[in-house]
Design a protein with these regions (language model features):
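Binuclear metal-dependent hydrolase catalytic cores
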Residues: 1-179, 189-190, 195-196, 257-287
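Active-site flanking residues adjacent to catalytic metal/cofactor-binding acidic residues
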Residues: 46, 75, 182, 207-209, ...
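Short, glycine/acidic-enriched loop or turn micro-motifs at the edges of active sites
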Residues: 50, 79, 185-186, 211, ...
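Glycine/Thr-rich phosphate-binding loops of Rossmann-like dinucleotide-binding domains
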Residues: 54, 215, 253, 281, ...
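Flexible, active-site-proximal loop/turn residues at the rims of small-molecule/cofactor binding pockets
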Residues: 78, 88, 211, 249, ...
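Cap/insert and terminal regions of metallo-dependent hydrolase folds
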Residues: 177, 187-276
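Structured alpha-helical
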Residues: 271, 287-390
Length: 390
């Protein structure tokens, strides 16, 4: 019997506002949007930030006109979690059907999410109003503590600590449990307990990690966000299996996120930093949690043939040393064929021998960062995409 599989895709991972700074391209600049495909085929979308547009462009049918039925959870109404709504092509295809879930805001009253839709598409802020969205839409208000089922999947919603309110969601599927807890500041005992209940035993715990512990203790206190340290401590306390650091600050460069991830991995083994294009698969009861990043190369690479020695860490946490040939390289990175499967978002030490003009070989010592892992062309090998960091 085939084990149930769920697939979680990250389309937007940045917090507060989108960024196009070249120093942030590796993790991505779009604001929050995730997609979860449950084993029974149910499609969930978590938040509608600017990453939603990218999801729409990858929709299965042209223009999104495929008769899809999708469930969308909106955690709260701040700009970075709703900005993608007017640009999501499947909303404009009449054969599609969407179920929306969010809370009643004390500032808006009844039908809060519908009001948010209408307001941000009202003239003169957008060329067309909400009537142009021909897809079928249903809105459901969710309260703190609500539990409900969608086909084979159980959903629980709890309040988190964020200005004007925010919901965290726990989605239990036959393949495992995903907890989405973005935009939360620790420190309120009741709301901290809500988060513990949501995250308990989760296979994937996606947690707000916008600030460093030093920032939260000083200049960012009261802004409604958390840190990698709080996520690690909570994941360990409640027995979450894999932690995903999420909602990266727009001022955090890739190297800053790298540093946050290294700090987190020193204290908790199974940690990833959310990155656009990252896909996490969950096997039966969460026994098989794997993260990978298929996708297009950032720059054009040239064919080459350099001998290389590679040192890194496998997915199981063991150090490996391997000799190989680098056949595909650019100024920014390389595609390396490896028998050992390195951990995604881990560091590789690459020593290459390159020919000089005088016929002699010189040695280059480079530090690389694993950004993607695909099936290799050689049996038993993986094609590992590496970005050079120095």
């Amino acid at each position: 019997m085939t084990a149930p599989i769920a697939k979680l895709s990250f389309w937007g991972v940045r917090g507060s506002t989108p960024t196009v700074d070249p120093a942030t391209w590796r993790y991505g600049g779009n604001t929050p949007c995730l997609e979860l495909i449950a084993p029974d085929g149910t499609q969930f979308i978590l938040d509608c930030g600017t990453g939603l547009r990218r999801l729409g462009s990858q929709w299965g049918a042209p223009n999104g006109n495929g008769g899809a039925e999708t469930h969308i959870f909106v955690t709260h109404y701040h700009w970075d979690h709703i900005q993608g709504i007017p640009f999501f092509a499947p909303f404009f295809a009449e054969n599609n059907k969407f179920h929306f879930y969010s809370f009643r805001s004390k500032f808006l009253g009844r039908d809060s999410l519908k009001q948010v839709f209408e307001a941000q598409m009202a003239l003169p802020y957008f060329p067309v109003d909400m009537s142009a969205m021909t897809a079928k839409r249903k809105f459901k208000e969710v309260e703190d503590g609500d539990t409900f089922t969608i086909k084979e999947n159980k959903i629980t919603a709890r309040w988190l600590n964020h200005p004007q309110g925010c919901l965290g969601f726990r989605i239990e599927t036959p393949a495992g449990t995903v907890v989405y807890a973005t935009d939360n500041e620790p420190g309120d005992p009741k709301l901290d307990e809500n988060l513990r209940e949501l995250a308990a035993g989760a296979d994937i715990f996606i947690n707000d990690a916008q600030y460093t512990p030093e920032q939260l203790a000083t200049t960012r206190k009261g802004w409604g966000h958390s840190t990698w340290k709080h996520g690690v401590d909570l994941a360990r306390e409640v027995g979450a299996k894999t932690l995903v650091l999420f909602h990266h600050d727009p001022d955090s460069t890739d190297r800053m996120v790298d540093s946050i991830l290294r700090n987190a991995r020193e204290e908790f083994d199974s940690v990833f930093a959310a990155s656009e294009g990252m896909v996490i698969t969950l096997g039966s009861a969460g026994d098989n949690v794997q993260a990978h990043m298929p996708g297009a190369r950032a720059t054009l690479r040239r064919e080459a043939q350099f001998r290389a020695k590679v040192t890194g860490v496998t997915e199981g946490g063991k150090e490996f040393h391997e000799e190989t040939i680098v056949r595909d390289i650019s100024l920014q990175g390389a595609l390396i064929s490896l028998q050992n499967m390195p951990r995604l978002q881990s560091e590789l030490q690459v020593t290459m021998e390159t020919p000089g003009e005088d016929g002699l070989h010189s040695t280059m010592h480079l530090r690389g960062y694993v950004v993607r892992i695909d099936a290799g062309t050689e049996k038993g090998h993986s094609a590992v995409g590496v970005v050079f960091t120095d």
